Amino acid sequence: MKTGRYIGIMSGTSLDGIDVVLAAIDETLVAHQGHYVHPIPHEVKTAILAMSQGQETTLAAVGELDRTLGTLYAGAVNQLLQRQRLTAQDIVAIGCHGQTVWHQPDGSAPFTLQLGDNNRVAALTGIATVGDFRRRDMAYGGQGAPLVPAFHHALLAHPGERRMVLNIGGIANLSLLLPGAAVRGFDTGPGNMLMDAWIWRRCRRPYDANAAWACGGRVLSALLTQMLADPYFARPAPKSTGRELFNLAWLERQLQRWPGVDARDVQATLAELTARSIADQVQLAGGCERLLVCGGGVHNPLVMARMAALLPGTEVAPTDKYGVSADDMEALAFAWLAYRTLSGLPGNLPSVTGADRPTLLGAIYPVNPYDAGVAL
């Protein structure tokens, strides 16, 4: 087994920063040892949003963004190493998810595309890098997502409790950790994505701090019902989604019948959409004793309170309470997936993604033996 220190990199659909974590990993333990959040420049966010919402682009723009993200990821890793007083030689490998710009798991030509040149990550850090995790699962008929339920199961499953782990990033995804049953997981729908997009559109703020804006509005029941009628919510698992569906264009179509609506009421309704779509899926799966929450949405007190109200008898709590950082969960997961790949172990769960078999995930970008230090 390739035990030792790993670094995980995650930049999700919320675009709230590049999360970089340091972890010591072996067969039984993932020990969180440090983290750093690297800012994403405004012009890079703009380019990502343009591509991921289906705007016309060019191959040159795709290539330039791929290179830029690779450079940003490497810079984030080097910042973490400096802060932890470590060198590249102290790290076994980096697990780099990349930035999803399009995820199309269904139809006649399913594919997923994450940008962030891992050749540059390996070259600029001097550390072997594992990336492009999702496409191998899709090659075996899977959705390529979610991949984190395997990690949730390894760290948070309990033999005597019905537990579910909920990640609320831009998209929300749920892992079902039920005793005696195969692990299942899927995307429930929008997490922070629509709330963040709406407050940016109306207030030029990147997110609704403490849900203060949403709390100034009221839920529009008819609008909520209309939103929940989107076919995605009724689809059975395995399923996954992203910004290519739940984006501002989707929201604007929903609002066509509501001219002059108060913007705060829309925000309140979007918060309720996130909470309700999650709670509905928890109940459809038979409920649970504990719903353990991670991702940026754990800091939204309105969504957390509404989930607790919609799920009486269920403890709704951050994963921190059970020993795993809610903010660093996904980056830790990709460090762990890199460990799995280098150790010759499968990283996907066919019961989650729908793939027809377990498989190693990702491509390996090795250290260059001809580098005398890394100065590019």
From Swiss-Prot:
It is an enzyme of class 2 (transferase). Pathway: Amino-sugar metabolism; 1,6-anhydro-N-acetylmuramate degradation; Cell wall biogenesis; peptidoglycan recycling. It holds the Pfam family AnmK. Disulfide bonds: none annotated. Its EC number is 2.7.1.170. InterPro entries: Anhydro_N_Ac-Mur_kinase (IPR005338), ATPase_NBD (IPR043129). Keywords: ATP-binding, Carbohydrate metabolism, Kinase, Nucleotide-binding, Transferase. ATP binds at G12, T13, S14, L15, D16, G17, I18, D19. Catalyzes the specific phosphorylation of 1,6-anhydro-N-acetylmuramic acid (anhMurNAc) with the simultaneous cleavage of the 1,6-anhydro ring, generating MurNAc-6-P. Is required for the utilization of anhMurNAc either imported from the medium or derived from its own cell wall murein, and thus plays a role in cell wall recycling. This is Anhydro-N-acetylmuramic acid kinase. The lineage of its organism: Bacteria, Pseudomonadati, Pseudomonadota, Gammaproteobacteria, Enterobacterales.
